[in-house]
Swiss-Prot record:
This is Probable nucleoredoxin 3. One of its GO terms (molecular function) is thioredoxin-disulfide reductase (NADPH) activity. SUPFAM superfamilies: Thioredoxin-like. InterPro entries: Nucleoredoxin-like, Thioredoxin-like_fold, Thioredoxin-like_sf, Thioredoxin_domain, TryX_NRX_thioredoxin_dom. Probable thiol-disulfide oxidoreductase that may participate in various redox reactions. PANTHER family: NUCLEOREDOXIN 3-RELATED, THIOREDOXIN. Its EC number is 1.8.1.8. Pfam families: Thioredoxin_8 (PF13905).
Length: 471
């Protein structure tokens, strides 16, 4: 089937009309026989598919929409359906929803064509580019191209694929927010209250492109973290940082539910830019936060990690800022004791969990790092690790502790109090956490005391008060 000749690259495949079908006629949707000669001069796509195949059933409506658009614009193309259904009844039932042509149902013929066109999976859409002297040139499977670019993928060949990828590169690297976030019909972003803001107003700002969805629990959790950082930056650095939500929701209702919890902007749900941005930046999972610098170019693809770890302190989200924060945390971590003694144990106990927790969540006020609010979601995730060893104590004598420190130390060493401590911890709020942080920051000289004893001393006081009432 392949041939090498002047003007033809080795390895290219060509087929003639007789080779293409192996039959004299094609079928129309109504069952009418169409002469094979009717497709001469047209751009042909071979559609290998079957009704029993779910990906095929999902792809067919997309192809149908593109086909109608192209035919309405007088594009000289035709699709030929090659059925891999199990029987003729299934083939006819599937074909009745297709406006294009089909080969007659023939299991032997389809097997031959699958070998001829290297079909290893379905759906498969094989474009055939016409040439003057070699019949039809066989192109690569275009299913992915059609799914990613829609009608813009036409005429579905390698040349068009290269053009589209070049256009994506230009949008990704060009630094033009209007070209990146807008389209012909829209030069604005929207907010939850319906206000339209010109994309040009975002020029010169640091932008977070947030890919998420309401149905995704990690997205809902990260939205809360991102909002905390966003609100803090809005107060401390007004106008410097903005977020654009790109919805991966399944419908408009879910999109509105997502947007209702967000104080920032969004791309409209039904806008084609949503799919384009997901393709341009190769989004593989959600939540994903990309950071664009004031020049409009992406310089950080792991915005979720840096926001979750540092919050607003990470701004402007550069590598140098992340390094600075890590150095501060390292000094904080290294200042903590590695081991403590417990009078009930002969050996020393390691404080790895508490130390690791403190190093990533609690920050002393220093010239280079501003105080931050505790992230309660993280606290709730970590508390079961923090309180696992109910016998742990520090080596300092109890007489040197403050009353708050003694409260928590006593509760910590008595297993019967742990359920109460857990209950209060789960019911704590931001104010409680901030009070704990202020208490910690107010006594830097006590850094040799277990960080947990200090940080949650106010919770212990509440529990002690309940114990006093019961007694």
């Amino acid at each position: 089937m392949g041939e090498t000749a002047e003007g033809v690259e080795a390895g290219e495949k060509y087929v003639s009309i007789p080779q293409l079908a192996g039959v004299g006629t094609l079928l129309s949707n109504g069952g009418k026989e169409i002469p094979l000669s009717s497709i001469e001069g047209k751009r042909i796509c071979l559609f290998f598919s079957a009704h029993w195949c779910r990906p095929c059933r999902n792809f067919t409506p997309k192809l149908l929409q593109i086909y109608r658009k192209l035919r309405n614009t007088c594009k000289n193309m035709e699709i030929i359906f090659i059925s891999l259904d199990r029987d003729e009844i299934s083939f006819l039932d599937y074909f009745k929803g297709m406006p294009w042509l089909a080969l007659p149902f023939d299991t032997g013929l389809r097997q031959k064509l699958c070998v001829q066109f290297d079909i290893e999976h379905i759906p498969a859409l094989i474009p055939l580019s016409t040439t003057l002297s070699h019949g039809f040139r066989v192109e690569e499977d275009a299913v992915k191209l059609v799914e990613e670019y829609g009608v813009d993928a036409y005429p579905f060949g390698a040349k068009r694929r290269s053009e589209l990828e070049g256009m994506d590169d230009a949008r990704r690297q060009g630094g033009n927010l209007l070209q990146l976030l807008g389209c012909k019909e829209r030069e604005y972003v929207i907010s939850a209250d319906g206000i339209k803001t010109p994309i040009s107003d975002l020029n010169g700002k640091t932008i977070g492109l947030y890919f998420g969805a309401h149905w995704c629990p990690p997205c809902r959790a990260f939205t809360k973290q991102l909002r905390e950082a966003y609100d803090e930056l809005k107060a401390l650095r007004p106008g410097n940082f903005q977020v654009i939500f790109i919805s991966m929701d399944r419908n408009e209702e879910e999109f509105q539910a997502s947007l209702s919890a967000m104080p920032w902007f969004a791309i409209p749900y039904s806008d084609t830019t949503v799919q384009e941005l997901s393709r341009i930046f190769t989004i593989k999972g959600i939540p994903t936060l990309l950071i664009l610098g004031p020049d409009g170019k992406v310089f950080k693809t792991d915005g979720r990690r840096i926001i979750s770890k540092y919050g607003a302190m990470a701004f402007p989200f550069t590598e140098s800022r992340a390094y600075e924060l890590e150095e501060v945390l390292k000094k904080e971590r290294d200042s903590l004791p590695h081991r403590v003694r417990d009078h009930r144990h002969e050996h020393e106990l390691e404080l790895d969990m508490a130390k690791a927790y403190l190093s990533t969540q609690l920050f002393h006020q220093t010239p280079s790092v501003q105080p931050c609010r505790l992230n309660l979601k993280t606290l709730r995730e970590e508390y079961h690790l923090i309180f696992t060893n109910s016998n742990r104590k520090t080596s300092r004598p109890q007489s040197s502790y403050t009353r708050q420190q003694r409260d928590l130390n006593n509760l910590y060493s008595d297993p019967k109090h742990l359920p109460q401590l857990h209950k209060h911890f789960d019911q704590s709020n931001v104010a409680t956490a901030e009070n704990s942080l202020r208490f910690l920051n107010g006594e830097p000289e006590n850094s040799d005391i277990s960080s947990i004893h200090v940080a949650f001393a106010d919770l212990a006081g509440k529990i002690r008060g309940e114990d006093d009432k019961r007694d």
